């Protein structure tokens, strides 16, 4: 319900005020726009060494997880705190103070000493017509503030499936609450496959979609670019041309006021509760 949702929103703001207030330009930008993009995040020599470690880990990985979504193939190596100790640059990255502060400000939590887990991720793209990844349509991950951190290990052009975000769409204003109320009346609102673009035949959703996409930001950027986005806002994975490849470090990070999502039925967690 919008009332409970707004109550959580106030708690997040109070938690942020208490634990980690925004100070830097980037931290304030993350709160205001819902996304911050930082080029040349690491010094060039440090990034070169990190990329060498990245390639070495992927090449020798014994625990590579492979996900296929039609013509898209994603190879994921999960990095743990224990494993990162064997790789100095990965260890430094997991302890990067600027990165940790940005996450802490966004989530409203006390800064930690080290990020415990993150993923090394290689993507290969086939025929766009056979791409079955649902995330090529705009969506929001959850009903409360949570963050997605993407660190480009390779250059990302228009054809390399760039991350796309609608700035300020994370804000819990009246328009967003009204959208959630209207969305909750749709038959598919509780499904993971729900996408606003499937309902543009309805005037309200068409108008709302037009409004949020006026501030669409396509993150086309070189390697060594850091992206942190509040995925309560609308975002998507851009389309990729055939035979394109990409490499990133991904850190999903979310504070969940409902507790672990696995303990809650999927339909309730995703929509019906609201």
Stretches with model-predicted labels:
Residues 1-32, 39-136:
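Non-heme Fe(II)-dependent double-stranded beta-helix
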Residues 141-158, 220-221, 252-255:
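Short, conserved beta-strand element in jelly-roll/cupin
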């Amino acid at each position: 319900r919008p009332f409970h949702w707004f109550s959580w929103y106030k708690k997040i703001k109070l938690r942020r005020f208490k634990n980690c207030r925004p100070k830097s330009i980037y931290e304030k930008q993350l709160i205001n726009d819902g996304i911050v993009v930082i080029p040349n995040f690491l010094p060039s020599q440090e990034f070169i060494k990190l990329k060498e470690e990245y390639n070495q880990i992927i090449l020798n990985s014994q625990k590579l997880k492979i996900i296929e979504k039609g013509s898209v193939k994603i190879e994921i190596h999960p990095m743990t705190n224990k494993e990162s100790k064997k790789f100095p640059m990965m260890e430094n990255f997991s302890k990067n103070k600027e990165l940790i502060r940005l996450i802490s400000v966004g989530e409203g939590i006390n800064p930690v000493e080290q990020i415990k887990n993150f993923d090394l991720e290689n993507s290969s793209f086939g025929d766009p017509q056979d791409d079955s990844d649902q995330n090529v349509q705009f969506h929001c991950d959850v009903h409360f503030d949570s963050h997605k951190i993407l660190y480009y290990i390779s250059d990302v052009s228009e054809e390399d499936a760039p991350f796309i975000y609608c700035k300020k769409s994370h804000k819990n204003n009246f328009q967003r609450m009204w959208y959630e109320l209207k969305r909750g009346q749709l038959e598919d609102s509780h499904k993971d496959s729900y996408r606003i673009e499937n309902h543009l035949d309805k005037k309200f959703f068409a108008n709302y979609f037009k409004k949020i996409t006026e501030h669409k930001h396509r993150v086309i950027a070189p390697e060594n670019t850091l992206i942190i986005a509040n995925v309560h806002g609308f975002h998507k994975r851009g389309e990729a041309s055939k035979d394109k490849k990409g490499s990133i470090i991904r850190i999903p990070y979310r504070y969940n006021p409902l507790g672990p999502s696995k303990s809650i039925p999927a339909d309730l967690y995703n929509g019906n509760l609201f």
